[in-house]
Regions:
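Boundary detector for helix-to-coil junctions that initiate low-complexity/charged tails
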Residues: 249-319
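Class I SAM-dependent methyltransferase SAM/SAH-binding core
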Residues: 48, 53-99
């Protein structure tokens, strides 16, 4: 039995085993999503925090690429963050330029998306790089196979559609040279249409593509964190983090937000201590009053006149 605390929601779990995709926590998280949040926490704060316990930093701006609702909703509470999708609204196509966002993002999250974007994948990676601030970073999970070479399934993809043919989806593509090609035996991840698998990465190829797109300090994560339910003893997408230029450091506004929240928490703790102290004083005062009353009752019980009245069934009954 594997016991762990989910680093997304903070709940305790006990599972007999993990698999690649099925959720292993009631919140919906799996090994892949918990690894993603672990990397994010370590890069932002230098320690492994539960996402639900992250400080609220609305000065930190971020974008999600098809993030799961179980952590996207919490990220939205914590940061100036919005989640987007490549296959449905709110749609965000990283293969197209977004000049209004250039240099504005502190981080981008991508969970098993890079294998789906249209070729060449460098176009999307370079756009992510362009949108990040100088200290910004990308955190991603990417399915990787063994070997060295990247395998592009459709290197000549240009104008294409996925159409049914005899009940089976096929890819119809018009290449740049005008040649028409039809491909069957398509691979889809979690759906159809835009979720078509475009390529198979290897760790070496992913590293090369990230560097070629301008990223620095590319780090792959394979360390088990059993207390958070992160185990790499089965097929898990490869977690990776890549910086734009500089190591990440919280900006002054974010540090000020943390200090304000700490002071607010400290004030609440001080008020709680005062309330507890006042409650203790009231309890002690009540105890003293009760003891004084009990002493007076004991004294009254020894009164000859009171005992006489009790013998005749008159007067107060004291115990």
């Amino acid at each position: 039995m594997i016991e762990f605390t989910c680093n997304v929601c903070g709940s305790r779990n006990a599972n007999p085993a993990f698999a690649t995709e099925p959720a292993s926590c009631a919140c919906g998280s799996n090994v892949r999503t918990r690894a993603l949040i672990h990397l994010l926490s370590m890069e932002l704060f230098g320690r492994n925090l539960i996402l639900a316990d992250f400080p609220r930093l609305k000065s930190v701006r971020a974008l999600g690429m098809s993030d799961k609702e179980c952590y996207a909703s919490i990220l939205q509470e914590k940061f100036d963050y919005r989640n987007t999708y490549y296959d449905r609204e709110p749609r965000f196509d990283f293969s197209q330029p977004h000049g209004d966002l250039a240099g504005t993002l502190d981080f981008v999250l991508s969970a098993d998306v890079l294998e789906h974007v249209a070729p060449p994948v460098e176009t999307a990676l370079m756009e992510v790089h362009r949108l990040l601030k100088p200290h910004g970073f990308l955190v991603a999970t990417v399915p990787c196979s063994s070997g060295e070479m990247l395998r592009e399934h459709y290197p000549d993809l240009h104008e294409y559609r996925i159409l049914p043919l005899g009940g089976t989806p096929v890819l119809v593509n018009r290449r740049r040279d005008g040649h028409l090609e039809v491909t069957d035996e398509l691979a889809f991840h979690g759906g159809s249409g835009a979720t078509l698998e475009m390529r198979q990465f290897t760790v070496a190829a992913l590293y090369e593509k990230l560097l070629a797109s301008g990223f620095t300090n590319v780090r792959f994560f394979n360390e088990n964190v059993p207390e958070c339910g992160i185990l790499f003893d089965h097929d898990v997408s490869q977690p990776v983090i890549a910086a734009k230029q500089q190591p990440f450091a919280l900006a002054g506004d974010a540090r000020a937000e943390i200090i304000d929240q700490w002071r607010s928490a400290e004030d609440r703790a001080w008020r709680d201590r005062q309330l507890a102290a006042n409650a203790g004083n009231l309890a002690r005062e009540a105890s003293a009053v009760n003891e004084s009353l009990a002493a007076r009752i004991r004294l009254a019980a020894r009164s000859r006149w009171l005992r006489l009245g009790q013998a005749f069934g008159i007067g107060p009954k004291l115990t």
